[in-house]
Amino acid sequence: MESLLAPLKIVGKEGMEMTCADGWVRRVYTILAAYIADFPEQCLVACCLESRCPQCLVLRDERGSPAWSHPRDQKKTAEILRQHAEGLKPTAFVSQGLRPVKPFWANLPHTNIFRCFTPDIHHQLHKGIFKDHFVSWSTEVVDGGSDEVDRRFKSMSKHPTLRHFKNGISLVSQWTGNEYKNMEKVFLGVIAGAVDERVIRAVRAVIDFISYARFEVHTERSLENMDRAWSAIHETKKIFLELGVCTGFNIPKFHSMIHYVPAVRSHGSLDGYNTESPERLHIDFAKVPFRAGNRRDYTAQMATWMSRNDAVQRHEMFLRWAKGNGIIEKEGEEGDDEAEPERKRRRKEGDIEVRGCHGYKVAKNPGYGN
């Protein structure tokens, strides 16, 4: 990563001229502002243990608490790592939960790597907090367990805007982002009347938080409601301890929710940093190329398959462009005996054949009156 981001050290200080979207050339100072990664990679980049938070100094046993902790400081962390590398053994190395990894971000200008980490709605909220924890805990509370929950999912009324889980949810092994969202829409109705009212309030607080986190545009009011939902989660979570379905909330994904509102304020809406969109690339660039080979020396075979597939796609794009501009004949034109009578008829009737013309759509009614 240090070699990959080395050009940012120069352009981050001196800048470079770039053509902007409006056509004007401006001097731009490019910096590392966002880093999208899963939790293990975030801890590796932050040079901290996976039992600690990569963004703040919360203690390893207090990640389930709603209390705020001091954020990590990049300059101080880099200095502690340097001292440890020289054998000085600073006490902060252990107290801050660091590990001996060379930080590639130490000399990047105008960068705070700990504030670059962005929330991951797909893995942290949809899959982690909701599905792996609150759905599992709620299912254990229901009399009859997963069988009763499946029966209730099957009994849900059908609606055009809602997905009907006709086989329940216990047999689904691979979930997509859309399936998580569809389950969140109806889960409160599924457990209504089957669990304690306090469980419903806790699940509702989680769903409210996830809904606000998915907003494409935020206001101060939406952020306040999001923070209020987060507070409601901590106020109602103890019901799961009382019912004995969980042993605690010292969970990294549970603690990560405290950083969502600050991330929105610093980076904007979180939909642009969600890993749900690139998750589909695992199929296109990993699973499909792997299955295309014989599983031996699969790395080289996958690279060859992807390069050939890319070449085929580029050639296909060229053929589309060439046909659209009349460089090569389309099917059913020159050289096609079946199309010759139709072409003669059009010439005889005076029809004009136009190739490579661009079409434009005009609004039926003007946007602004004269």
Residue ranges of each PLM-predicted region?
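Domain-level detector for long, ordered catalytic/regulatory cores in large eukaryotic signaling
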Residues: M1, L5, K9-V186
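Terminal interaction-prone segments of large eukaryotic proteins
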Residues: L88, R99, N107, D120-N370
